[in-house]
Amino acid sequence: MTVPAPTLLPAAGPPHAHGVPGDEAPGDAARPLPALLAEVRAFLRERVLPLEPRVLQEEFRDVLPALRAVRAEAKARGLWAPHLPRSLGGLGLTLREYAEVSAVLGETPAGPYALNCQAPDVGNMELLHQFGTPEQQ
């Protein structure tokens, strides 16, 4: 007995394929995905991977000043919050694009934190954006 292969969604995906539904259209990122992935890899190699031994061996509070500097640089380089729409300071990636960026970030434990897309905060940001009061947003 053979099991049919699952059908794939169209390239654009369903309306909720965007990181946060209701904002920019899917694929409305500011730069092509291959260029973004190259930038993220370079940023990890240059700034995040050198901190990995400290992240793994030291108390978080002791590494936090260095991580804050890395996060500020990520924001300055335009790599901040890939899951959020550009209107909120994010990259406006589709869910598929964000998945590819996440795969790169997952190469180091500090990768998602460096770009402000670590669990569980990512989901909280999306929920607050969609359903939070103005003060919460």
State what each model feature region is.
Residues 16, 49-137:
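Glycine-rich flavin
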Residues 6, 45-46:
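Catalytic cores of phosphodiester-bond-cleaving enzymes
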Residues 33, 40, 44-45, 74:
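Short hydrophobic motif
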Residues 35-39, 80-83:
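Short low-complexity stretches enriched in small and charged residues
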Residues 1-32, 37:
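Intrinsic disorder at enzyme termini
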